[in-house]
Amino acid sequence: MRFAPGLALLGLLALGCRSTPPPPAAASAPPDLIALTRFFASREANWGYRVSPDGTRLAWITSHRGRTTIFFKELASEAVGIIDTHTPRNVFGFAWAQDSRRVLYLHDRDGDENFHVYLASTEQPDAPPVDLTPWDGTRSWVHRVIRADPDHVIVASNRRDRSVFDLYRVNIGSREAMLIAENPGDVVDWMTDWDGRPRARLRHAGPDARQLEVWRGGGWAGLQAFDLEEFDVGLLGVTPDDRGLWLLSSRGRDRRSLLRVEIETGAETLVHEHPRVDVEWIRLSERTRAPLAAYAAPDYPATHVFDPVLAADLRRLRRATTTGLRILSLDDEERRATVEVFTDKGYEFYLLERGAEPRQLGRSHTMAFAHALATVEPIVVTSRDGLRLHGYLTRPSGFAAPGPLVLLVHGGHWVRDHWGYDRLVQFLANRGYAVLQVNYRGSTGYGRAFAELAVGEYAGKMHDDLIDAVRWAVARGIADPARVAIYGGSYGGYAALVGMTFTPEVFTCGVDVVGISNLLTFFESIPPYWKLSYAPRFLKYVGDPSRPEGRERLLAKSPLLRAGDVRRPILIIHGANDARVSVRESEQMVAALQAAGKDVRYVSFPDEGHRRDYGNWRNAVRHHAEVERFLAACLGGRRSTGP
């Protein structure tokens, strides 16, 4: 199966949605109660199948001895091996090095997000992995695996200056690291070509400005200027003729689109856009250096395939019009590929090979109890000021409506919710709760104009959108207004605290996970490497603490100062090593609530950080057992007697 480089365009899987779901059906018998461990610590979990560059081996993540690690096998003999990572913590992802003998993966220390790059061998899987970035207190990741150079990888690291990232060429045999691109203090992102040479960079050029520069004539030269919102730019790669750059960019347009930009002139050619939403991700061919597929998410997932041969192969994997497809990996010759096929019930993984039928490699453990899982429906809510808010509703199977509702608020706020399998959503639905997710104003994915509607609207119109979503669910007979919880992590945790303090009459209880309680102290404690990426947007959207009016605005929108207004129970959960939102945010909120005599329960994990996917399964199970007990007490849902 050689994937042709032509640009035959095939739009897959783009559907509309209903703004009004069908009326609640009469309740049938509820499904069996699914054990906590099957959602959050399953021994059957497996994902991330990737074929090696030479096409001879396959590797994936699966469970082993109470944690996730990397398995691999020979495609010819089916012989399976296990890489011993010599750590009790979970592995979440990996990449093949230049051949089938080595894999690369990241690990931090107890969730602190100071990631190190590790190299492990499939030839000696029991040998201790090699730390390629043994620099204490630093954050590193693999920027590029150079296919033509089996001895080196390009690594980004803040080794020299904790606030910015340089590029290093690291010898994976000797661990020698050579600095190849030093950050002058204002570079936000780098692009290297297919041989690992720095070719483009994005610079912070002022409070609301960015500059795209290219390496030309022995130095860096300006190519394009951006404002802050146009800075939603992704540097993808160099074009096949070496004269252009592939970018995902919203410069001069509302939606993020795939562009070709000429290196000499900066002239743009629009290659692909979605008519309704941003293009989120592009798969480039390592062989042809041309785009293979574009991914977007209008309501259900949409995959736009540029290559007609690949499109025909992927079409054979479609189960339904709502099926999502992701290309996970290809070998160097693009004769073999691994593909993820997903629905709202779970995932299946396939090997595509030229001249052969698709071969199933694995399926998520959830497929064994898919019949007990709920359906995720795209919805549209109209806000009080007439804005169309897209989101998702998951109604519990077998329960009468109206019933208890959990408003699940995504973090960010510069991200969005997507359709698909979400273990937290399905866990809550299995306990008898309807789950409502809304992409409130400011969520990414819906264009620049929608994102900018959030400027100045923390604890304002962004929160109004959440309240309007609850009212929508109540008006349609989905939610009992006396049994509504608000639950979120990170920004979503902040939103949960806002809900419990600014609108305490709306919510029966709230769950705040790694949330912000004081916007001023939060900004003062952000990691140094956020100064170029996150900080400018915070200043624009929320407020500038260096100015008196900015400090006043931040404090006015901080739940901490309204702890006395809380009326109902709150559960607060935080990882002690959180690098993004300091654990102090939860500690000070808990102290204020306790001083005011409020009903609050606090759970802290000393060996975790900010991630929703815990490094230790034991912590994940305890977290969700706490949530299960808390929601059962305040909303009346089901709970298990043990893990």
Show which residues each predicted segment covers.
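Bacterial Sec signal peptide processing site at the extreme N-terminus
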Residues: 18-29
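Short hydrophobic segments within beta-strands
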Residues: 248, 394, 408-409, 487, ...
